[in-house]
């Protein structure tokens, strides 16, 4: 797969049709090729392929951090619900994260909360994308 991608990139450079890449495009390409925890350079700066929620979940597993991450996930879910793009899966994740927190399973709670927060963030992004596509679909 990596050889194919490299070959395509090389052919694009030879043909002179290389388009400028946005950060999101570069991040998504690096994440798809290398998974989380990979470092890459974009416009001279170093970044990792970790989502912000994964970074937050990597904090020390204790009650305070687990409570904060769950609260952040609930707040992000509320934003997704405001635009009517709250996924039903997320509600179950929040419930599971809360149960793990109550059981003292802080690492588990943090990991589930991070997933819930990510899904909510993607729900809001999905809303914005649908609005943009809707505007593009409406004839002038």
What does each of the following model-derived ranges do?
Residues 1-2, 20-21:
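Absolute protein N-terminus
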Residues 2-10:
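Sec-dependent signal peptide recognition
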Residues 14-17:
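N-terminal signal peptide c-region/cleavage motif recognized by signal peptidases
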Residues 21-140:
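Long, charged/polar, soluble alpha-helical segments
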